[in-house]
From Swiss-Prot:
Gene Ontology CC: chloroplast; large ribosomal subunit; plastid
Domain of life of the source: Eukaryota
SUPFAM superfamilies recorded: Zn-binding ribosomal proteins
InterPro entries, per database record: Ribosomal_bL32 (IPR002677), Ribosomal_bL32_plant/cyanobact (IPR044958), Ribosomal_zn-bd (IPR011332)
Protein name: Large ribosomal subunit protein bL32c
Localization in the cell: Plastid, Chloroplast
Annotated source species: Oryza sativa subsp. japonica
GO biological process: translation
Residue ranges, annotated region (Disordered): 38-63
UniProt keyword terms in alphabetical order: Chloroplast, Plastid, Ribonucleoprotein, Ribosomal protein
A Gene Ontology molecular function term of the record: structural constituent of ribosome
Main localization, broad class: plastid
Amino acid sequence: MAVPKKRTSMSKKRIRKNLWKKKTYFSIVQSYSLAKSRSFSGVSEHPKPKGFSRQQTNNRVLG
């Protein structure tokens, strides 16, 4: 015999909704920090061009 389910209380709904929101928030924060680190990691892969400052350090006079 089919029995209707009891209705879920508003507080339980709110708790479950907030848990879902927390999970999504933390996944967003994690993905944002990963994207930030990836965008700045490319800086170290490409060395700076050797310019005036590089030549100046090599031509020091020791005395």
